[in-house]
């Protein structure tokens, strides 16, 4: 085991804070409508240009072990916020940096870090309750478009595309983002279905960039039992191989010898297959397999219907134009099922919804209707160059997450103003002692920081703008894109409540951990072994007396 270095107290914290600052300073320049770009080096190909906070954070690894620990903890803030809310990564990083910076001053002056953390947690809880109160539901297409535009760095065309896609497939529908072929963004709505089961082995992946398995014009085999013996599958595999098309196997499970054989065939390019588990459990699994069968124009191979795997033919298999299998979900696009059969199935499920007695059953049945009838919307991102395409695609994906979050929990005024307004709930808050009061003050100061950074990135004086916004009420705030003080919700500058809430929660959580850290353990760099001794130089012993 390698030797470890243990650093205590202020020495450990100071180094970790340096790491926090390096990462946060690189990320925060991207905040707001006038945020700057960050260029990321790639080991091959040209550099990537981005204004996405989490993309910048993920690239940062520092040489100093302690600094790197601090940076990685704040990277966690950005990643968690991105995973939970899809946006707000830069805001979360700015909040975390501010809480750490202010908190360290109090720790250095001798205050109790645990009480500071309790004060911080108390203030954050009050602020989140206030955010929920001032939140308003996001229902209209216009509001959805505004959220999408803000999240895509004030690009209204992206917001409009997302609103249009949600309008076409419904709020619950599946929306995916792909590379376009032209300079313009395009929207395609394709009949399709997505369920929450992914590939059973990563060896099925054939698109390493997106970490997905893509099958073009495949057959779909549906089976309600486990498949472990390859002999059961051989007859149908031979028929599919002759047809020269890929195959998706959806069964209760595919394991052992059967899975190994499919993987080997896939790697050798003999037969392109992907195996996934059937979605749902029990009776619901049977119903969902039946849904997929109707959508793809196939049949479920089950003993109840008198069909067995050994005797299955291509006629019993479903078909689709394209299927994408990711780690955790499978999307079937343009199934070959008859429209009339799909319509009849939807009608049948809607009848079951009306008769359902439990909320859970009703919710699951509604999900099935959305999957059968909703389809999949594909936003094709257009750009002039590949670098621009990648950057724009990342923004569209961010905006898509943000709009989903807005539909889920509502919207608040954007531009850092919601956090300024939520401070009113903290202003009168009192802790159990002076140290907890200091923790509350830390959060009060931190909640100004996103607005300050947005204004600074826009080239204006932050203190003046913060004072002017704090003096106002409601949605009155500073629109950094135009440099005017307006009602931000009317101007379309809005943030999803979930994004603002998640950013504050995650920032406080990780910053609290950093403040209460009193020792850090890291590996010492390995010392290079000394070089083996060699023969002395020159021609020893060959001297000549003159």
UniProtKB/Swiss-Prot annotation:
Which reactions fall under this protein's catalytic activity? ATP + H2O + a folded polypeptide = ADP + phosphate + an unfolded polypeptide
Which cellular component terms (GO) are annotated to the entry? cytoplasm
Q: Which residues bind ATP?
A: 30-33, 51, 87-91, 415, 479-481, 495
Q: Kind of enzyme, top EC level?
A: isomerase
Keywords noted in UniProt: ATP-binding, Chaperone, Cytoplasm, Isomerase, Nucleotide-binding
| Location of this chain's protein in the cell | Cytoplasm
| GO BP terms in the entry | protein refolding
- Keyword Chaperone assigned to the entry: answer is yes
* Chief location bin: cytoplasm
Q: Which family does it belong to?
A: Belongs to the chaperonin (HSP60) family.
Q: Could you describe the subunit structure of this protein?
A: Forms a cylinder of 14 subunits composed of two heptameric rings stacked back-to-back. Interacts with the co-chaperonin GroES.
Protein name in the entry: Chaperonin GroEL 1
Please report the organism this UniProt entry assigns to the protein: Paraburkholderia xenovorans (strain LB400)
């Amino acid at each position: 085991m390698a030797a470890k270095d243990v650093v205590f107290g202020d020495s450990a914290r100071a180094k970790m804070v340096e790491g926090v600052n390096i990462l946060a300073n690189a990320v925060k320049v991207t905040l707001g409508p006038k945020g700057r770009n960050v260029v990321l080096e790639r080991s091959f190909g040209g550099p990537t240009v981005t204004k996405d906070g989490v993309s910048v954070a993920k690239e940062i690894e520092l040489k100093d072990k302690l600094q790197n620990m601090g940076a990685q903890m704040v990277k966690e803030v950005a990643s968690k916020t991105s995973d939970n809310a899809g946006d707000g990564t830069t805001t979360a990083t700015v909040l975390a940096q501010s809480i750490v910076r202010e908190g360290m001053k109090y720790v250095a002056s001798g205050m109790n870090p645990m009480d500071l953390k309790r004060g911080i947690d108390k203030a954050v809880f009050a602020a989140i309750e206030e955010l929920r109160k001032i939140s308003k539901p996001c229902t209209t297409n216009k509001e959805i478009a505004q959220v999408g535009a803000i999240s895509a760095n004030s690009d209204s065309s992206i917001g409009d595309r997302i609103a249009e896609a949600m309008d076409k497939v419904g709020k619950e529908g599946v929306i995916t983002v792909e590379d376009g072929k032209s300079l313009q963004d395009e929207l395609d709505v394709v009949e399709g279905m997505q369920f929450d089961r992914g590939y059973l082995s990563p060896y099925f992946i054939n698109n390493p960039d997106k970490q997905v398995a893509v099958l073009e014009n495949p057959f779909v085999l549906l089976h309600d039992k486990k498949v472990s013996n390859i002999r059961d599958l051989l007859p149908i595999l031979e028929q599919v191989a002759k047809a020269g098309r890929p195959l998706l196997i959806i069964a209760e499970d595919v394991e052992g010898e059967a899975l190994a054989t499919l993987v080997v065939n896939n790697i050798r390019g003999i037969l392109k297959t992907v195996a996934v588990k059937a979605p749902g459990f029990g009776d619901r699994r049977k119903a969902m397999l039946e849904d997929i069968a109707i959508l793809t124009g196939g049949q479920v191979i089950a003993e109840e219907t008198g069909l067995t795997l050994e005797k299955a033919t291509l006629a019993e298999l479903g078909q689709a134009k394209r299927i994408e299998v990711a780690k955790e979900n499978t999307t079937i696009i343009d199934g070959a099922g008859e429209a009339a059969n799909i319509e009849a199935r939807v009608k049948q499920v809607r009848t079951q919804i009306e008769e359902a007695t439990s909320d859970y059953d009703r919710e699951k049945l509604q999900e099935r209707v959305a999957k059968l009838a909703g389809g999949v919307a594909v936003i094709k991102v257009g750009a002039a160059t590949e670098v621009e395409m990648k950057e724009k695609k990342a923004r569209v994906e961010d905006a898509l997450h943000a709009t989903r979050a807005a539909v889920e929990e509502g919207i608040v005024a954007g531009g850092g103003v919601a956090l300024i307004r939520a401070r009113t709930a903290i202003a009168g808050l009192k802790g159990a002692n002076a140290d907890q009061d200091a923790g509350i003050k830390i959060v009060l100061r931190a909640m100004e920081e996103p607005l300050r950074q947005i204004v600074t990135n826009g080239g204006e004086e932050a203190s003046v703008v913060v004072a002017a916004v704090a003096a106002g009420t409601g949605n009155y705030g500073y629109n950094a894109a135009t440099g005017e003080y307006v009602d931000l919700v009317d101007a379309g500058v809005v943030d999803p409540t979930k994004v603002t809430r998640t950013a504050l929660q995650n920032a406080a959580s990780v910053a609290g951990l950093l403040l209460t850290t009193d020792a850090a353990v890291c590996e010492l760099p390995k010392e290079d072994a000394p070089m083996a001794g060699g023969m002395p130089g020159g021609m020893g012993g060959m001297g000549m007396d003159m």
